[in-house]
């Protein structure tokens, strides 16, 4: 980027002194908002076309400005554009380059427009596109998770289900995958809902109060792919709730991906041994030759924190800004850019990694059988015989204590020990003690029984289309 050369500012008419160099450095946003160059030029092309349609500019002026903008865009795409710090931001850089290329007629581009509505429309365009792109990437991961659920349902792979990270009850591995499918479906929906709400163009709001020029805001909104213009000019230039909603959706998705990351990290440890992550998505140690580190999942878990921080940062920025535009709002973009970039790569990595992850069914089944995971099934067995569930719970709790003190599992207890705990317990309860029967018994809607999981997969497959 070219440093300041103290050219005359496009807004410099009322100023008698040049901008202080440190102020210029502090004030400039072109280092990051140049990312909006494509959106900025699209907005300008729509604006100048509308100015011609309503008779504010001649057709020759429209053509000259439009061709000039096209040439500037070509330079940007080619990487030959000279971004200058003294021109502050993407808008002034583009307009100054246009002026250098086509002369004073470039100044007519800004008729009936302010940088306030210009940046608002640029940022909305970017954020709307980012929301829809993350929705698509979330959908792709959802499809991968669904395929994994289908694969593991066919083999009826059993996994221990946990509460408090203690073995709770056996579940199907497919049921575990479907839990994340459900989360990702809501995540995708949040991005699409946010994109629909931000589908309004602030272009034409001007500085804050609208403009006396006879512009057609509906025309520019349509040209830019928006459903409608914003209904209030103050709101159009002064609100950033669309960015907050986007960041909120990012934060919730990040929380889900962080939970997934934590489970994959734990399940891949030597102590658990439930799965093996692919070599392509793990790393080694500089000193310990045996190490295979889950860096992708660890970074995905950690990066959730920066996404949360981006949301909190923007909330803190906007909470004290009066209507309408304030320079504070320059701080709205980097967090959105960063969250979008972060989630884009995490979603892609998991979409690649999960199908290559190997689950060890014999290990997960053995783990599911430990920790007295079928104790609730024994209590249910008694309850079906008419024993009040709380009494059954007390009886089985005593059996668990007996087995635990003697280093045994429930199925190791003798018939006499079972009947001593309750006369309705005996050899026939053994069937309730298997993890397979425990899983099959959970037939309630949304449960882990194979038939219920199969239904959930079918519904999820239909929802994906």
Swiss-Prot record:
Q: Does the keyword Cytoplasm apply?
A: yes
Q: Which UniProt keywords apply?
A: Amino-acid biosynthesis, Arginine biosynthesis, Cytoplasm, Lyase
Name the PROSITE patterns on file: FUMARATE_LYASES (PS00163)
Question: Catalyses which reaction?
Answer: 2-(N(omega)-L-arginino)succinate = fumarate + L-arginine
The terms describing its cellular component in GO are:
cytosol
What metabolic or biological pathway is this protein involved in? Amino-acid biosynthesis; L-arginine biosynthesis; L-arginine from L-ornithine and carbamoyl phosphate: step 3/3
Q: Name one GO molecular function term.
A: argininosuccinate lyase activity
Question: Which family does the record claim for this protein?
Answer: Belongs to the lyase 1 family. Argininosuccinate lyase subfamily.
HAMAP family per the UniProt record, alphabetical: Arg_succ_lyase (MF_00006)
Q: What is this protein called?
A: Argininosuccinate lyase
- Native species: Deinococcus deserti (strain DSM 17065 / CIP 109153 / LMG 22923 / VCD115)
Organism lineage string = Bacteria, Thermotogati, Deinococcota, Deinococci, Deinococcales
């Amino acid at each position: 980027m070219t440093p300041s050369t103290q050219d005359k500012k496009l807004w410099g008419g009322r100023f008698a002194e040049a901008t202080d160099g440190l102020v210029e450095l502090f004030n400039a946003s072109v280092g990051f908002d140049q990312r909006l160059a494509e959106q900025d030029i699209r907005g300008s092309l729509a604006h100048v076309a509308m100015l011609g349609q309503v008779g504010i500019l001649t057709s020759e002026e429209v053509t000259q400005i439009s061709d000039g903008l096209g040439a500037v865009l070509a330079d940007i795409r080619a990487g030959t554009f000279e971004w200058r710090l003294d021109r502050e931001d993407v808008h002034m850089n583009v307009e100054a380059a246009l002026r250098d290329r086509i002369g004073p007629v470039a100044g007519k581009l800004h008729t009936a427009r302010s940088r306030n509505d210009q940046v608002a429309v640029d940022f909305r365009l970017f954020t709307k596109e980012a929301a829809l792109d993350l929705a698509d990437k979330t959908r792709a991961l959802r499809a991968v998770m669904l395929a994994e659920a289908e694969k593991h349902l066919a083999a009826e792979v059993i996994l221990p289900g946990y509460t408090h990270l203690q073995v709770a009850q056996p579940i199907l591995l497919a049921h575990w995958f479907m839990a994340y499918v459900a989360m990702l479906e809501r995540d995708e929906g949040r991005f699409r809902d946010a994109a629909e709400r931000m589908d309004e163009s602030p272009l034409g709001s001007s500085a804050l109060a609208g403009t006396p020029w006879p512009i057609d805001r509906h025309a520019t909104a349509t040209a830019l792919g928006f459903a409608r213009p914003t209904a209030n000019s103050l709101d159009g230039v002064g609100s950033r709730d669309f960015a907050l909603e986007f960041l909120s959706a990012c934060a919730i998705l990040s929380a889900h991906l962080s939970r997934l990351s934590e489970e994959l990290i734990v399940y891949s440890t030597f102590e658990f041994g439930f799965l093996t992550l692919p070599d392509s998505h793990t790393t080694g140690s500089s000193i310990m030759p045996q190490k295979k580190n889950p860096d992708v999942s660890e970074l995905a878990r950690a990066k959730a924190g920066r996404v949360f921080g981006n949301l909190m940062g923007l909330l803190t920025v906007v909470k004290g800004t009066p209507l309408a535009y304030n320079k504070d709002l320059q701080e709205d973009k980097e967090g959105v850019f960063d969250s979008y970039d972060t989630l884009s790569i995490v979603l892609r990595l998991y979409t690649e990694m999960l199908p290559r992850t190997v689950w060890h069914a014999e290990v997960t089944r053995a783990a599911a059988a430990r920790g007295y995971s079928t104790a609730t099934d024994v209590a249910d067995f008694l309850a079906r015989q008419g024993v009040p569930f709380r009494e059954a719970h007390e009886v089985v709790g005593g059996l668990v204590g007996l087995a635990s003190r003697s280093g045994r599992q429930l199925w190791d207890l003798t018939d006499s020990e079972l009947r001593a705990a309750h006369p309705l317990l005996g050899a026939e309860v053994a069937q309730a003690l298997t993890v397979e029967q425990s899983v099959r018994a959970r037939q309630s809607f949304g449960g882990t029984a194979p038939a219920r999981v199969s239904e959930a997969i079918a519904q999820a497959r239909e929802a994906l289309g």
